[in-house]
Regions:
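Core catalytic lobe of class I
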Residues: 1-270, 307-315
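S-adenosyl-L-methionine
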Residues: 1-7, 273-314
């Protein structure tokens, strides 16, 4: 359904995280729906007042907003930066930090400038804006530590061979605490998550049942990072452009409450394939059909009972 109408049904100050990836302002129309580039900024900003209203003071708004080229010329559009600036200047959001999602498996695009004329590099990075309602949103970077580098692993085994605690020429003080094992390294704001899934349960069941696959899915590791980073178990996560409901799946696996909005009923119904445990796969066709006719469907998960209900294309 219309995400703006559905947002109106949420209570003020009730949401801990809005995590979403809206249809980008691409020059070519997509089957999943995307606004014309000239109208896009105003269209997307139409959601800003309601997003800010439903967010808690400690809440965050994370938006994956990839870039695009201007029509017919090898010059980048600034639409996503205009969205960011206006969200902050006109609607009072705070830019907590900018992240960049690097997808090493992304295909070269646009074909005209990259493949044919070879005058531009492959576009493999999406800006991801982390915005907040106040200056102090809830966050804990220690919950999303990454694996140490091989060199750091060697240092932890035998610190004396690698460095001596002292002040560096740069003025930085490297103490003996540098060799402490903290269970992982703090992540940077460059997030490398390949988007190369080709054999997931969702894709297999869509193929078996001849159900249309959502064509613009981000990898689950992306929303999982921000759900872990910015919320606690039991918090409420909302995706206003859910597509195949990857954000909802990430939230479910991390024991968060979640609500997802999607304008295409078929996409939101098919997203049930991501949640079905192995012992319920035989029910996939029945559950999918029930959801298409707005009949709630529940099934047992390893740790809980999930009631999956499509209500005006919201689940």
């Amino acid at each position: 359904g219309d995400s703006l109408d559905l947002l109106n049904n949420l209570a003020s100050n009730s949401v801990d995280l809005v995590m979403t990836s809206p249809p980008f302002a691409l020059q070519r129309k997509k089957s999943y729906g995307n606004e014309d580039q000239d109208l896009y900024v105003d269209w997307l900003l139409g959601f800003a007042p309601e997003i800010k209203r439903v967010l808690k003071d400690t809440g965050s708004f994370v938006i994956d907003l990839g870039g695009a080229y201007q029509k017919g010329i090898p010059v980048r559009s600034l639409y996503n930066y205009r969205v960011l600036i206006r969200l902050c200047d006109e609607y009072g959001f705070k830019l907590a930090q900018e992240f960049f999602w690097f997808n090493p498996s992304k295909l070269p695009s646009p074909i005209e400038w990259v493949n044919k004329k070879k005058i531009r590099a492959k576009d493999s990075v999406n800006p991801v804006w982390w915005l907040s309602k106040t200056n102090q949103p809830k966050a804990n970077i220690s919950k999303v530590k990454v694996e140490y580098s091989e060199r750091m692993k060697k240092l932890l085994k035998n610190a004396d061979e690698f460095y001596t605690p002292k002040e560096r020429p740069s003025g930085h003080q490297i103490s003996d605490k540098f060799a402490k094992d903290n269970g992982g390294a703090l992540p940077s704001n460059l997030l490398e998550f390949p988007n190369s899934d080709s054999n997931s349960q969702y894709l297999r069941l869509c193929k078996e049942m001849n159900v249309k696959v959502h064509p613009a899915r981000f990898p689950q590791k992306l929303p999982s990072f921000f759900v872990n980073f910015l919320t606690e178990p039991g918090d409420l996560v909302v995706d206003i452009f859910s597509g195949s409901n990857t954000t909802g799946c990430a939230a479910e696996e991390l024991s968060r409450n979640w609500i997802s909005f999607e304008q295409e009923k078929q996409y939101i119904a098919a997203s049930i394939f991501k949640f079905l445990p192995q012992e319920s796969l035989w029910q996939a066709d029945e559950i999918y059909t029930k959801l298409l006719i707005d009949e709630p469907s529940g099934f047992k998960l390893p740790q809980s009972m999930l009631l999956f209900e499509v209500n005006n294309y919201c689940c």
